[in-house]
């Protein structure tokens, strides 16, 4: 496994919404290049960029029309290669978003596959509901070989690997996952032979399967059995200050996945992504700081969705754009400063491909960087602490010491062969306590007040988070 994943912290870029440098109302590769220093200063050292290939953009670029060509609205292949170079100049890494399970109807493969006369593309797509080919039949094998060619092309140009869209769905009617696992094992064998440092991250949501398939990491997501939504995106999120949430089911499922994942790969807990409501739609203000203390102290590589680091909001009541439907409000343009269109674009407001948050109090990078008490600075502080302590990084062990049903706080130990750190997270706006004897050497980080350790009991202030070196 690539060594750089040990301390990787990812920043997800939705390219059309990040920064527009040519005034067409759509973000571009040059815009990403111009903001790499911001990403690095925040503390992130890796990037996942959403699809950037040629597309009619009926589904935000997930409808690929040419896997070998950058979307002209973002730039050229040469521009993308330059982006890879600029990322690497800063000792960072970048993953592209690979969409292997479907294409746009505009893709030449699909147009050929539609023809009545059989040809080399006839079996590249599934055309019937009543039967399907075996993954080892010539048609599916040719498709897999072509996906390997796509990977070979972009890794050769300089990308460091791929986040794979809907990775667990390529083999249909595969209830136990064995068909998909076998398919991805073949891809892993190919990569290990030609590009052993290339990283694969899956959108699967079942680490017990994806990591068997050779992925380095899998996300816990808003779908699937992880109880991820219990944390931030349900009627009573655990990270709401109301303190009516429940983290127990999430922890039980996490422990189950963690045991299965040991020595095979990593489990990632993202702040959000382009398919979810913004984090700030359900939790707010200081609650966000406590949430990031959790996200940045768990095993696996953290993923920060663009804008989450300044508390960007879900923009309500937007018309669907590029197939976003209810997700469109989470894809609004990045808010950089106080200038026109919050610094995203010099285009007239009505020319932006999707509307922005037009609130007078919308958060911006400029304002948050100027405010020492901002969410931006809290995240920066948390990342610095994580990078200074290997026990808090991707491969440090975790042991949950308090995660009771409908109770607060959440407490867990992070450890490696160098140190042991107790993490206590209390989003509830009330003081709580739990039993435990801990000899604390140093409070590495506190927000909202410091826990008190006396008489075999730990008393935790409301709305607080703390990392304690034992």
Question: Model-found features: residue ranges?
Answer:
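Beta-sheet entry/capping signal
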Residues: 46, 91-93, 151, 160-163, ...
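C-terminal beta-strand-rich structural cap/linker in extracellular carbohydrate-active enzymes
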Residues: 454-470
């Amino acid at each position: 496994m690539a060594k750089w994943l040990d301390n990787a912290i990812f920043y997800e870029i939705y390219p059309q919404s990040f920064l527009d440098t040519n005034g067409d109302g759509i973000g571009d590769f040059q815009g990403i290049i111009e903001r790499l220093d911001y990403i690095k200063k925040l503390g992130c050292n890796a990037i996942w960029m959403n699809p950037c290939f040629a597309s009619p953009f009926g589904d935000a670029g997930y409808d690929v029309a040419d896997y070998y060509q950058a979307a002209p609205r973002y730039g050229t292949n040469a521009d993308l290669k330059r982006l890879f170079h600029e990322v690497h100049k800063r000792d960072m890494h970048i993953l592209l978003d690979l969409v292997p399970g479907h294409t746009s109807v505009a893709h030449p493969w699909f147009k050929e596959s539609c023809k009545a006369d059989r040809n080399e593309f006839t079996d590249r797509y599934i055309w019937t509901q009543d039967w399907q080919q075996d993954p080892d039949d010539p048609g599916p094998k040719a498709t897999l070989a072509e996906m390997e060619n796509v990977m070979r092309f972009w890794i050769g140009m300089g990308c460091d690997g791929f986040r794979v869209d809907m990775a667990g769905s390529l083999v249909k009617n595969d209830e136990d996952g064995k068909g998909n696992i076998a398919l991805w094992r073949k891809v892993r064998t190919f990569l290990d032979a030609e590009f052993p440092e290339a990283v694969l991250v899956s959108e699967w949501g079942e680490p017990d399967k994806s990591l068997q398939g050779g992925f380095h990491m899998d996300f816990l997501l808003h779908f699937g059995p992880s109880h991820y939504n219990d944390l931030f995106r349900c009627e009573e999120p655990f990270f709401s200050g109301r303190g009516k949430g429940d983290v127990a089911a999430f922890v039980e499922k996490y422990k189950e996945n963690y045991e299965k994942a040991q020595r095979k790969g990593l489990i990632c807990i993202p702040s959000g992504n382009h398919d979810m409501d913004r984090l700030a739609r359900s939790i707010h203000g200081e609650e966000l700081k406590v949430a990031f203390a959790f996200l940045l102290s768990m095993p696996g590589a953290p993923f920060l969705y663009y804008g989450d680091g300044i508390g960007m909001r879900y923009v309500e009541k937007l018309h669907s754009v590029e197939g976003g439907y209810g997700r469109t409000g989470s894809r609004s343009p990045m808010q950089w400063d106080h200038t026109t269109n919050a610094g995203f674009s010099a285009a007239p407001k009505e020319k932006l491909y999707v509307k922005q948050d037009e609130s007078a109090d919308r958060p911006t990078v400029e304002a948050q960087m100027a405010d020492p008490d901002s969410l931006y600075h809290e995240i920066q502080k948390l990342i610095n602490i994580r990078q200074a302590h290997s026990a808090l990084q991707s491969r440090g062990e975790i042991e949950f010491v308090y995660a009771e049903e409908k109770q607060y706080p959440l407490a867990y130990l992070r450890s490696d062969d160098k140190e042991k750190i107790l993490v206590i997270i209390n989003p509830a706006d009330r003081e709580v306590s739990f039993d435990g004897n801990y000899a604390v050497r140093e409070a590495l980080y506190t927000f909202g007040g410091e826990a008190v350790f006396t008489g075999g009991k730990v008393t935790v202030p409301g709305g607080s988070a703390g990392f304690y070196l034992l």
